[in-house]
Amino acid sequence: MRMKCTISYDGHLFYGYQVQPGQRTIQDELEKALQTLHKAKERIPVVSSGRTDSGVHAVGQTIHFDSPLSIPEAKWPYALNALLPDDISVRKAEAVNDQFHARFSAKRKEYRYMIYRGRHPDVFKRYYAYHVPYDLDMEKVKEASRYLVGTHDFTSFCATKTEVKDKVRTVHELEWSDTGDGLQMRIVGSGFLYNMVRIIAGTLLDVGTGKFSPGDIEKMILAKNRDAAGRTAPAHGLYLWRVIYDN
């Protein structure tokens, strides 16, 4: 039986999602928990919708795994959460057909980037929002954001070590909202390149400070060169919010 699970995790104390020898990762903790639950000699492989870097959080990451156990859907979260550390939580579990794939069946992903605007650092937010105490021209930030919506070659907005050759992606939505003591950037796309959301966030903040004009975004897209765009915003402000599938 193939199980699809929606999980949340606090990325602060993890060395990213993917298993890495000698490091604490989300995938490693999930596979250890499943191995214990199944009383198996070997790991139960877990497939995710995609990897997240060290420090990046998830509200709605999706995983799948195959299991011979006859556990009711509603009981799976309880069974796994009892074996997982308290910075990972299984929120929902459902049985799916064998053709479902957490990564390849995904149609869209939503990320959010959190910014704290207080004058002084907040010790309770230091791992969960990027502290930006300086003034930002949000009208220009929103104007610049519109250039990024649509289908483009995002070479300028991904890390230079990105291995995939096709860097064309579609951004369906990109919007900013006031959270009271900060800002939230919400972005929905068909898929994202390595560091793409963080580079978009950092570049748009650079527009807000006046380093770039809104129209410069169009030039950056056409340049297809990472050096043309702005900074990479820190990992700790980024959240994988949800993964969207066909019903």
Curated annotation (Swiss-Prot):
Gene3D superfamilies tied to this protein = Pseudouridine synthase I, catalytic domain, C-terminal subdomain, Pseudouridine synthase I, catalytic domain, N-terminal subdomain
Q: A single GO BP annotation from the record? A: tRNA pseudouridine synthesis
Q: Mind listing the UniProt keywords for this protein, alphabetically?
A: Isomerase, tRNA processing
Could you tell me which SUPFAM superfamilies the record lists for this protein? Pseudouridine synthase
Top enzyme class, one word, equals: isomerase
Q: What does this protein do?
A: Formation of pseudouridine at positions 38, 39 and 40 in the anticodon stem and loop of transfer RNAs.
State whether it acts alone or in a complex, and with which partners, per the record.
Answer: Homodimer.
**Which species is this record about?**
Bacillus licheniformis (strain ATCC 14580 / DSM 13 / JCM 2505 / CCUG 7422 / NBRC 12200 / NCIMB 9375 / NCTC 10341 / NRRL NRS-1264 / Gibson 46)
- From which domain of life does this come? Bacteria
Keyword Glycoprotein annotated: no
Give the UniProt family note.
Belongs to the tRNA pseudouridine synthase TruA family.
Q: Where does substrate bind?
A: 111
| Molecular function as annotated in GO | RNA binding; tRNA pseudouridine(38-40) synthase activity
Q: Name one Pfam family in it.
A: PseudoU_synth_1
Stored NCBIfam families: hisT_truA
Question: Could you tell me what reaction this enzyme catalyses?
Answer: uridine(38/39/40) in tRNA = pseudouridine(38/39/40) in tRNA
What Enzyme Commission number(s) does the record list for this chain? 5.4.99.12
What InterPro entries does the database record attribute to this sequence?
A: PsdUridine_synth_cat_dom_sf (IPR020103), PsdUridine_synth_TruA (IPR001406), PsdUridine_synth_TruA_a/b_dom (IPR020097), PsdUridine_synth_TruA_C (IPR020095), TruA/RsuA/RluB/E/F_N (IPR020094)
Residues the record marks as active site: 53
Protein name from the UniProt record:
tRNA pseudouridine synthase A
